């Protein structure tokens, strides 16, 4: 602590950018910051079960080294001394990597995910691995290895998934930011439910390397590379200003994820926004109707832009109701994915046996991922002809949206039909992921942001979408709307 000035502030409420600046200026100690984050996580964990694995001792060692680097005037990375968490299934060499599966209960990561390696090189310190849905196959965080993660605003409600544990740690002030992954809303859905910012970057920007299907065993398989093209790793943050900094650090080709072809640099000045398209689609087929709170949030977002002189237009397409099935069709027809291969961790999956074991109280798999795998097998039975019309709808939407996204336009629409529902609700409403999942197969960047208000005690959110490679436009919009609506609100823990 010698040489470090002390400031009287709640460090846990600050952004990663602010914390890095204070550490660099010797205003706060990385050691003190890590201890405060650990203390907060020890408060939150018994209430929400957000953490899968604690990395406390390694983090303390890293913080001591980070403090020494500051005091001795050594070169510092952009996020030097700033703690973060990451999804358990991403992979941190030597740490557990069960992905929430009993079949992998003794598995440890043999390598560190590219995005985590880049954050470490920037000086950030991993504090914990976040709980997740089993094999990242469900929009709720509940598994047979680590248990269920609870929402910090109302513990009777879901934290979302699959990156639910990290979203809760960010929302409750345990870490300033986290790394998640998104193949069908797995960053954006928990971000929405926990009142934080979550970005699924443009296709081709951030490598998935380390996470299924680009893990140590599968990364070279053609099907793995094809599936990864519809996934992305990305940041979860309390403040919009952190999104771009983290994105700059983690973006760019690594030679493993063959879908990646570019990096990201924040532009020196914001591109003026000229048009905002407001979309309030009919409910996704077999999904939940939009709540009044979410509908009002989308409309009010448009109104705030109109007040700034931005042109605001309504936009929709009838095929948006098929969003879930478009997502499923693309994955089935263009990647040949079989979720049973992942749920069974490469071993054949016997559905009758798995269902019998679940009914007998001896489950092998979490209910949600097992249902997802069954639904996926139904898609196999439909075959390509049965799914072909959804591929045509994908092509139509891609063309229509590409015509809207001219580099100065964004789309505003729901991320979820309402606020976080009760635990287990996704079993009755799995199709609700369509609002987010659609943009995985379209490839456009999509960002979920909190509206600074609550409904039924839980955060309300909207989703922003821009053209391919126009991530900076989304980040600027997030900063504007954060100022307009207030952004993150501290949960009552």
PLM feature spans:
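A short helix-breaking turn/cap at a secondary-structure junction
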Residues: 200-302, 485-493
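Short glycine/serine-rich loop segments
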Residues: 112-247, 440, 445-452, 458-461
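Acyltransferase
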Residues: 30-35, 64, 290-316, 339-351, ...
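Short helix-loop capping/hinge segments that flank enzyme active sites or metal/cofactor-binding pockets
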Residues: 79-99, 272-281, 333-398, 402, ...
């Amino acid at each position: 602590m010698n040489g470090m000035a002390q400031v009287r502030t709640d460090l846990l409420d600050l952004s990663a950018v602010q914390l890095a600046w204070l550490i660099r200026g010797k205003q706060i100690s990385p050691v003190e910051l890590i201890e405060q984050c650990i203390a907060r996580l020890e408060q939150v964990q018994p209430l929400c079960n957000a953490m899968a694995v604690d990395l406390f001792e390694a983090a303390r060692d890293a913080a001591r080294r980070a403090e020494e680097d500051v005091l001795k005037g050594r070169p510092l990375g952009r996020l030097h001394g700033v703690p973060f968490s990451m999804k358990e299934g991403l992979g941190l060499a030597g740490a557990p990597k069960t992905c929430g599966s009993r079949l992998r209960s003794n598995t440890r990561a043999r390598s560190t995910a590219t995005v985590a390696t880049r954050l470490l090189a920037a000086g950030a310190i991993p504090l914990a691995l976040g709980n997740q849905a089993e094999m990242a196959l469900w929009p709720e965080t509940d598994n047979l290895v680590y248990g269920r993660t609870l929402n910090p605003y109302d513990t009777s409600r879901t934290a979302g998934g699959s990156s639910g544990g990290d979203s809760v740690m960010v929302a409750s002030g345990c870490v300033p930011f986290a790394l998640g992954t998104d193949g069908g809303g797995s960053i954006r859905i928990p971000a929405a439910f926990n009142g934080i910012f979550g970005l699924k970057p443009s296709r081709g920007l951030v490598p998935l390397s380390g996470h299924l299907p680009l893990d140590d065993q599968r990364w070279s398989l053609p099907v793995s590379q094809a599936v990864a093209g519809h996934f992305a790793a990305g940041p979860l943050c309390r403040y919009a200003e952190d999104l771009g900094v983290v994105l700059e650090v983690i973006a760019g080709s690594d030679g493993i994820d063959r879908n990646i072809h570019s990096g990201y640099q924040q532009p020196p000045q914001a591109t003026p926004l000229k048009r905002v398209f407001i979309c309030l689609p009919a409910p996704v087929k077999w999904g939940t109707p939009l709540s009044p709170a979410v509908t009002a949030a989308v409309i009010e977002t448009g109104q705030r832009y109109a007040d700034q002189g931005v042109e605001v237009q309504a936009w929709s397409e009838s095929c948006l109701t098929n969003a879930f099935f478009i997502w499923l069709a693309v994955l089935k027809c263009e990647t040949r994915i079989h979720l049973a291969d992942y749920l069974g961790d490469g071993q054949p999956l016997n559905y009758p046996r798995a269902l019998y074991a679940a009914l007998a109280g001896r489950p092998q798999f979490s209910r949600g991922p097992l249902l997802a795998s069954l639904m996926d097998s139904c898609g196999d039975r439909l075959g390509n002809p049965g799914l072909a019309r959804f591929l045509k709808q994908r092509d139509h939407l891609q063309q229509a949206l590409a015509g809207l996204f001219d580099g100065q336009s964004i789309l505003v629409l729901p991320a979820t039909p309402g606020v976080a529902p009760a635990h287990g609700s996704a079993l009755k409403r799995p199709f609700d992921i369509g609002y987010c999942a659609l943009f995985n197969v379209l490839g456009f960047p999509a960002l979920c942001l909190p509206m600074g208000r609550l409904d039924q005690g839980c955060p309300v959110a909207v989703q922003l979408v821009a053209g391919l490679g126009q991530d900076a436009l989304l980040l600027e919009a997030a900063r504007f709307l954060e100022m307009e609506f207030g952004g993150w609100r501290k949960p009552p823990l």
